[in-house]
């Protein structure tokens, strides 16, 4: 993600009235001087994700953002999206929200394989926790 992002937390807890809110991933972008709320979804984009993100951004701006910082930004990452549906869902939103997709792969790229241990080594290390 680059050197301009600072990790703040995962499942970051906020309150809205008496309701608990949990943001999947909260980052801070140094150059933008903005909090970045990221929501990870396993399926296709749904309009209610935008409403929930607006709630998160409002709570962040009221409770966490410092006066000298810019408004918080939301990113919703889904497995798939219908571009027109996303545009309609975000059309009247005043909050900066983006929607992105991800792709799953069955194999790791070659350069990443070199960085990770073999599956047998991972299994061996995990057995330590079973004991």
Question: Which residues fall in each region the model found?
Answer:
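Charged, terminal alpha-helix-loop-beta segments
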Residues: 1-131
